[in-house]
Amino acid sequence: MGDPKFHHKKYSTPRHPWEKERIDEENKIVVKYGLKNKKEIWRSEALLSSIRSQARDLRARLRTNDVNAQKQLERMIKRLNRYKLLSENATLDDVLSLTVENILDRRLQTIVFRKNLAISVRQARQLITHGHISVAGRRVTVPGMLVEAKDEDTIAYEENSPVANELHPIRQALLAPAQRSAEMKEGQGEASEEGETDE
């Protein structure tokens, strides 16, 4: 089992390291989620494997009318719901249908990018590791942290970070596309009004 004070691997490497289809699929995931390396995929796969293993065990125990199995299933679904991986009314089949991308979608790095706090998913990682992002008022520097649903709305720039200033170049770059689209809409509106007056 090993000494608990030492770090242990939280993932296992692929059994066949040179499978082209798997490598291509992993490369797409690395680009999509801005991952540092494939270990981050394997770590998510290990977590998913653990969840599925528990679900399969519970399914077998439910068939034998195990008294505690239903309670454990409810606790599992409640825990997964806390991370917005499943709904409150989810079933065992929903647990078994979870994918690696469902796990990666709950990473802090992914959510920072989707909340439009970074220009790219890679930049989201940089902002987190450099201490520019806070969750529930606390600075977080771990891009791979799984975010609970209750904390998602509290993700913001760290108050003492220079990026928190709206005049920071990153903030201006984030505002630029929105401003351009707003100006285009205004221009289209003015053009249509002019057309109506000409008639």
From Swiss-Prot:
Recorded hits in SUPFAM superfamilies, A to Z, give: Alpha-L RNA-binding motif
Where in this chain does the record put each S4 RNA-binding domain?
A: 106-170
Alphabetically, the GO molecular function entries are:
rRNA binding; structural constituent of ribosome
Q: Matching Pfam families, A to Z? A: Ribosomal_S4 (PF00163), S4 (PF01479)
Q: Which domain of life is it from?
A: Archaea
Question: Has UniProt tagged this entry with the keyword rRNA-binding?
Answer: yes
Give disulfide pairs as residue numbers.
Answer: none
Entry keyword annotation includes RNA-binding: yes
> What keywords would UniProt list here?
Ribonucleoprotein, Ribosomal protein, RNA-binding, rRNA-binding
GO cellular component term, pick one: small ribosomal subunit
Q: Name one GO biological process term.
A: translation
Q: Please list where the region (Disordered) is annotated.
A: 177-199
PANTHER family noted in UniProt:
30S 40S RIBOSOMAL PROTEIN, 40S RIBOSOMAL PROTEIN S9
What does the function comment of this entry state?
A: One of the primary rRNA binding proteins, it binds directly to 16S rRNA where it nucleates assembly of the body of the 30S subunit. With S5 and S12 plays an important role in translational accuracy.
Please state which protein family the record places this protein in: Belongs to the universal ribosomal protein uS4 family.
Cite the NCBIfam families for this sequence. Answer: PRK04051.1, uS4_arch
Assembly and interaction partners: Part of the 30S ribosomal subunit. Contacts protein S5. The interaction surface between S4 and S5 is involved in control of translational fidelity.
Q: Please state what the protein is called.
A: Small ribosomal subunit protein uS4
Q: Which organism is it from?
A: Thermoplasma acidophilum (strain ATCC 25905 / DSM 1728 / JCM 9062 / NBRC 15155 / AMRC-C165)
| Gene of this entry | rps4
